[in-house]
Amino acid sequence: MIDPDGFRPNVGIVLMREDGQVFWARRVRRDGWQFPQGGMNTDETPVEAMYRELREETGLLPEHVELLGATPGWLRYRLPSRAVRRNERQVCIGQKQVWFLLQFTGQESHLKLDHTDSPEFDHWRWVDFWYPVEHVVMFKRGVYARALRHLAPLAQTVAGPAAVGVMPQRALEAWLPGSSAAGHDRPRKRPRKRGGVLPVRINND
């Protein structure tokens, strides 16, 4: 489904260990690495979509994670022009996402990238909290920076400030308005919330 502005509702997942390292996976038959993410079905809430995508892309069940929180509202990014299919009845120009922070409480043996017949990833590893902002494909760097910036205070309550650290300068530049990686659209301004996160009750729009 695509909203009237051309954005597809989507969820993103930051899966974090107790030490602040996050799950980082390589897409099948591609060199690109990213966080798990996926589109929402019309009958799903963001939370329901998140658990479905978690199962499909990592093999994990709800009992293998603890849901810590989510970004406030939708964060948007635009697709590069080469990826926009103009001949479709509904043209998708980008994604609007809710990002979830999950603490991994299971065992690594629970991670199964081949859980479905069409796996999204073929390899994974743990990386530092801010690493993905500088290594994801360029057009996603702005939304990654915004998502991790919102979730970092909550991550620090689990892993500690030293383990999570602060956003590196290059990652900060990806988030700042005017950056080529930040995208043309930015989330609408909302009242600041303590800790940068909202409760998990998020309504679809």
From Swiss-Prot:
Q: Which CDD domains match?
A: NUDIX_Ap4A_hydrolase_plant_like
Family per similarity comment: Belongs to the Nudix hydrolase family. RppH subfamily.
For the region Disordered, what residue ranges are annotated? 178-205
Q: What molecular function terms (GO) are annotated for this protein?
A: pyrophosphatase activity
Q: Which domain of life is it from?
A: Bacteria
Which keywords fit this entry according to its UniProt record? Hydrolase
> What InterPro entries does the entry give?
NUDIX_hydrolase-like_dom_sf, NUDIX_hydrolase_CS, NUDIX_hydrolase_dom, RppH
Q: Which cofactor does it need?
A: a divalent metal cation
Which protein are we looking at? RNA pyrophosphohydrolase
* EC top class, as a word: hydrolase
- Gene3D superfamilies, alphabetically? Nucleoside Triphosphate Pyrophosphohydrolase
Segments forming domain Nudix hydrolase: 6-149
Q: What does this protein do?
A: Accelerates the degradation of transcripts by removing pyrophosphate from the 5'-end of triphosphorylated RNA, leading to a more labile monophosphorylated state that can stimulate subsequent ribonuclease cleavage.
User: From what organism does this protein derive?
Assistant: Xanthomonas campestris pv. campestris (strain ATCC 33913 / DSM 3586 / NCPPB 528 / LMG 568 / P 25)
Q: Does the keyword Hydrolase apply?
A: yes
